[in-house]
Structure formats: C-alpha cells, structure tokens
C-alpha cells in the first residue's frame, strides 16, 4: 500500500520517498491505493469493539467484525470505490469509510489516485519517519492510517462531550431535555418514552393477562407467551425463540463462544447471568433470603427448593407412576427407572450406555485418550465434565448449595453426603 502527501510517499513500514506532483502539493491531501483486495489488517483503521447483529459476539474492530460476518450465508460483497477493499455488509463499508471523512474526504477520482507510486528506489529498509502530527496531543505518527485512527479517538471524545451537553450529535439537534435527570434527546417521542422511567407509567396493557408495560415493543414481545409465536430460528439446529437475545445466547452452544470473563479467576461464561452467579463465589453475596426462617442463599433455585421444607410441598410429579418429589433433580433421577434404555454397546468390553456421549467417553478408557487438559496445571481428563470439576480446585468455586443450611460444595457428591446429616436428624 502507498500513501502520498505533499511531501512524499509511504510505501511500507519506514519507507518514505519524495514524489513531485503539483496537484498533490497544492491540495495538501492524502491519497490511498491498495494493490490487492484482501489487504492485511496491519495499518488499517481500528474502531472500538463492535457486536455482530446476527449472532451477538463482540469483535475488536470493523475489519474483524466483517471477517466474522462473512461466515454467515447468503451475503453479498460491497466494494469500496476508493481502495477496492470488499465487505460483506454495506454498513461495514460505510463504517470503514467514516475514518477518512473525519477531516479529509477520501479521494475517489481515478485521475487523482494516479499520483500514487510504488517505492522502487531501494529495497533496503529506510529510517522510520513520522510526518503526521496529532494536533490534539502533539504525538507523532508514521505515515500510516494510524494517524487516521488517532483522529477517530479524539472525534469520539468530542462527540461524547457534545452528547452530554445536549449539542448536535451526528447532525441532530438535541432539543428535548428531561426535566428529571437532564438527559437530552433529538426526538420528542423518545423523551416521552424515557420519562416513563421516572413516572412509572405503563400505558401498554396485555389484553390476555392484564400485565402492563412502558414500551409497546415490550408488550409485543410479551404477547408471544400467549400466542406461542417464536419468530427467531437457529440456523444450526432449527430451535425457535420468542426473543432475539435468547437466540443469540443459544447460538453460543454451537459456536463455543464465551464472551463474559471473571476478573477474579479468569473463567469464561457464555451468559452474563452465569458470570453474575459465579462472582458470588468471590464476593460472598447471598441475595436470596427465606421469608420464613431468614436463611440466605446464593442461587434462587436453592431458595425455592429450601422453601418446600416449610410448606411440605412436593411439586414435581412423575408422569409414569405419580410419585412426587420436592426437588426437580430428584424427579429426573427417578424417571430414569421408567425411560432409560441402553442402545450403545462397547465392542471392547460389552458395556451398554444410554447416551452416545457416555459411550464415546467410555471408549477413551480403552484408547487411553485424554483430550481435556487443565490450562493451570496440565492435568488431563477423559471427559470435559471431569475437567470442569477439577478446575474448581484452582478457582475455589462451590456451585452445589445445601437448601437446608446454605453450605456450599465443589462436588455434588459432597453435597449429597452432607444432606444426609439433615435427613437423619428428621428421622
């Protein structure tokens, strides 16, 4: 790639040569030429992290976002008329071109772009030069698009300040200001909708159940509970959802994406709610309190299970024999008596399994394969569940909580053993 200014041309890292061109000198502009469509990411403008509207993951910049979106099917290429770079989405092309319109528009005329020349003077490395100076911070930058990136940083700061003060934002005047909190809006209907946060007004009522909402979009989303409408379908497995965010979360099962990281132990999670629950291991929070005895719990499900002690309720009924249970996991364990079949046979030892995953994991006993390795200590395991269980040694996580007393354990077997203390006391 070659950059040309009034003073010279940049043809590679640290490569700067004088180019005599009257048009270039008079207009004091920058022209850009890219010799190949698939230009590398080095030296190209970088933006802040951007989310994929199709499946949810957050990418570090517009180029990584567009590369990721190319994995989705049925998308057409959009080409930048100035440099030839191709994008899967037109919106990404526009975002890419914005970088050049911060101060100087990107040239599109072919005759003007013809002044760009390749460096043929010498193949030897030249002393690194930094001909561009940032007016905001007096920092020097090499003759790369990094200067453009720096301008974008300051542009964002100015935009943020402009938004806070109620000035124009992207050409819109922020005429409508909230009298409660001072937040400004460009449209009156947006202000009216915002003010319902303060007033508590909920004008949109569900005709089926009477539940009210502050936004019409939320009512439409709620009504799908009654209509059974599930318009968002997973392209991988065909499962449908009533909400787009639920589909986005579900897709992480297929992609393996885990965008939420715990700052304490570095563990990753696919759902933000799972991260919040996990962080209670570190901060000791127990937000769920029993109204009968005052005991507190880390998980809402544990509180619900605990409350059955006071009510004597056994809400989980077996559809096969009618037996009822106080806990859902106890019902699931019981139902295996009625439903379990074992179609998967190991040809090595003749053992049968009800699930293919158990069969595959069992075969590793014979092959010696241990594909799941702990990144902390290097210990390897046959099953991913065994690795997850082992990692609690390093993280200190104790996800199994006693519904009687709130004591937590790292293994379900330890919780079961502990709960016998309570059941023995009631006999």
From Swiss-Prot:
Keywords assigned: DNA-binding, Isopeptide bond, Metal-binding, Nucleus, Repeat, Transcription, Transcription regulation, Ubl conjugation, Zinc, Zinc-finger
Zinc finger regions, C2H2-type: 50-72, 78-100, 176-198, 204-226, 232-254, 260-282, 288-310, 316-338, 344-366, 372-394, 400-422
Protein name per UniProt: Zinc finger protein 134
GO CC annotations, alphabetized: nucleoplasm
Subcellular location, principal: nucleus
Function (record text): May be involved in transcriptional regulation.
Keyword hit for Membrane: no
Biological processes per GO annotation: negative regulation of transcription by RNA polymerase II; regulation of cytokine production; regulation of immune system process
Entry's Gene Ontology molecular function annotations: DNA-binding transcription repressor activity, RNA polymerase II-specific; RNA polymerase II cis-regulatory region sequence-specific DNA binding; zinc ion binding
Family, similarity comment: Belongs to the krueppel C2H2-type zinc-finger protein family.
Cross-link (Glycyl lysine isopeptide (Lys-Gly) (interchain with G-Cter in SUMO2)) at residue(s): 20, 135, 139
Localization: Nucleus
């Amino acid at each position: 790639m070659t950059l040309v200014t009034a003073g010279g041309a940049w043809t590679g890292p640290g490569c700067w040569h004088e180019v005599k061109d009257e048009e270039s000198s008079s207009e004091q502009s920058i022209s850009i030429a890219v010799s190949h469509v698939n230009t590398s990411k080095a030296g190209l403008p970088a933006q802040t992290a951007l989310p994929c509207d199709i499946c949810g993951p957050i990418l570090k910049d517009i180029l990584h976002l567009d590369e990721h979106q190319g994995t989705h099917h049925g998308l057409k290429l959009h080409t930048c008329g100035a440099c030839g770079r191709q994008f899967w989405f037109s919106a990404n092309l526009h975002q890419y071109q914005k970088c050049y319109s911060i101060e100087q528009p990107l040239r599109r005329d072919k005759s003007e772009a013809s002044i760009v020349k390749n460096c043929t003077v010498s193949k030897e490395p030249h002393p690194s030069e930094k001909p561009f100076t940032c007016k905001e911070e007096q920092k020097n930058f090499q003759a790369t698009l990094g200067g453009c990136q720096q301008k974008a940083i300051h542009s964002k700061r100015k935009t943020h300040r402009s938004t806070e003060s109620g000035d124009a934002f992207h050409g819109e005047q922020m005429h409508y200001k909230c009298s409660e909190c001072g937040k400004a809006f460009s449209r009156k209907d947006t202000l009216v909708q915002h003010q319902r946060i303060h007033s508590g007004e909920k004008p949109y009522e569900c005709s089926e159940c009477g539940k009210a909402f502050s936004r019409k979009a939320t009512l439409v989303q709620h009504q799908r509970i009654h209509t059974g409408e599930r318009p968002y379908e997973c392209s991988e497995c065909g499962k449908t959802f009533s909400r787009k965010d639920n589909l986005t979360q579900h897709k992480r099962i297929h992609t393996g994406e885990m965008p939420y990281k715990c700052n304490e132990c570095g563990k990753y999670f696919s759902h933000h709610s799972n991260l919040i629950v996990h962080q209670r291991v570190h901060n000791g929070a127990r937000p769920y309190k029993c109204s009968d005895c005052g005991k507190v719990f880390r998980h809402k499900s544990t509180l619900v299970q605990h409350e059955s002690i006071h009510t004597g309720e056994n809400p989980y009924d077996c559809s096969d024999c009618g037996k009822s249970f106080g806990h859902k996991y106890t019902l699931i364990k019981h139902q295996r008596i009625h439903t379990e079949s074992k179609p998967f046979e190991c040809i090595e030892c003749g053992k049968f399994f009800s699930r293919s995953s158990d069969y595959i994991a069992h075969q590793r006993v014979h092959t010696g394969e241990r594909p799941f390795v702990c990144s902390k200590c290097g210990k390897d395991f046959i099953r991913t569940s065994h690795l997850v269980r082992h990692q609690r040694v390093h993280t200190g996580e104790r996800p199994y909580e006693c519904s009687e007393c709130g004591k937590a354990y790292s293994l379900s077997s330890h919780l079961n053993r502990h709960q016998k203390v309570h059941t023995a006391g009631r006999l």
